[in-house]
């Protein structure tokens, strides 16, 4: 060994007390044995809107503690005609609400969307929850007996505070009956389909078939001690209002803010959807592909099947078509002599005043080349130059035809309109499918009357992405970085006498062009506050809301 290294060790001061870094004293743990346990639930339709509810009762004299809940859901075979697919992560999106209760009341509960948000950085959990090409790609049935989707089972990891440190954080039963209750979303929230698919029949025949699994621990001579858990509480603001308030905030570990689109019952139809492939490019490619069949037409005369307001022109010899202040180059090879190439110059249009700015999707294409196939009667496109973005793909069809639009907005063919898709994904955030457009330009949080935090940039969103390793567009203020389980979490603490017992959030929405249809997508502000509770096991399992530093 090198002399310098040897001398650096020999010359060390032996009088200093040092910790052993080459060995540790092993401790004998509590005697326990874990087991995977599964059970069926009792199904009812007692939800707020006749939603399906599954209740799972856990009471076994040999189960001392439990954690790591997994919900199994069977998806049926889908047969019939039309286009159909399940939303990505369909298992999570089936869930509206989860609660864990004892005879003393609710111990912990969470909304389905917040459960999904908590698991968004767990790729394995997301994969098993129903993220596959078989489930999520849009499949087509051509006859009533066609199988559109094979039956499948998805597995939803229900992440709870009892999973943080395995045995330490597990929920101790304390000879109590524990009930896990899952409220499900309507079936319309979890499927993507076109108007030709018989959704009414599918909805009537669809039955949620869940099974709950968990890790149960049999423990010998268990010594149960009180612990702390964080319980999320969600407040949804009024439509298009920039404020939301969480009341009765006494000890909070974090506060999260995001926006959601509100489409209503008639605004959830869209032109395209990519299915399993969920990158921004996939959304844009799917949208462009849908538009091209209506945009460039090879025909032996003026194209038919379009509304009277459609402005379709024949492409001249030089291939250049002028649309207002823009030029589009079109070159289609192998066109038969008796046919011509046409360009649709007002495919989708929007404007709030005549003779002012017009948002025209046709103008967003600058060059289109391809080859016409006489055998298939279709054009194979080779090169498309365009400026279509994720916002364009996220515009509901209804906005093109809304009363705010002074133009005949949707000039597509009847055949194309029939392929539009109903998308009612309950967990979409922001105003576009990928939540890329940051529509909050300023955020202010008040605790009582005092300004707790304000920002003119997205720094709270950046920190949330860095700390959680997820990209869900949520802005989060975290008040607790204390290691879990072994310490009481740090909280922002109320002072009721001074009015400090509510968190008020106000945002300033980003400026958008009123002539862009996306401006009219309604939105809601969502605020999620994590309250701190103490779990006690004196007489069964019960929780107490922390009211200050001394609890």
From Swiss-Prot:
Primary location class: membrane
Q: Which UniProt keywords apply?
A: Membrane
Which InterPro entries does the UniProt entry name for this protein?
Poxvirus_Rif-R
Tell me how this protein sits in the membrane. Answer: Peripheral membrane protein
Gene3D superfamilies in the record: Adenovirus Type 2 Hexon, domain 4 (2.70.9.10)
Q: Which GO terms describe its biological process?
A: response to antibiotic
Q: What induces it?
A: Expressed in the early phase of the viral replicative cycle.
Q: Which GO terms describe its cellular component?
A: membrane
Ranges that cross the membrane? none
Cell compartments where the protein resides: Membrane
Q: Which residues form the signal peptide?
A: none
Has the keyword Electron transport been applied to this entry?
no
Task of the protein = Scaffold protein which forms a transitory spherical honeycomb lattice providing curvature and rigidity to the convex membrane of crescent and immature virions (IV). This association occurs concomitantly with viral membrane formation. Targeted by the drug rifampicin, which prevents the formation of this lattice, and hence virus morphogenesis. In the presence of rifampicin, irregularly shaped membranes that lack the honeycomb layer accumulate around areas of electron-dense viroplasm.
What family does this belong to? Belongs to the orthopoxvirus protein OPG125 family.
Partners and quaternary state?
Homotrimer. Self-assembles to form a layer. Interacts with OPG158 (via N-terminus); this interaction is necessary for OPG125 association with membranes.
The miscellaneous annotation reads: Displays structure similarities to capsid proteins.
Identify this protein by name. Answer: Scaffold protein OPG125
Annotated source species = Variola virus (isolate Human/India/Ind3/1967)
Which gene produces this protein? Answer: OPG125
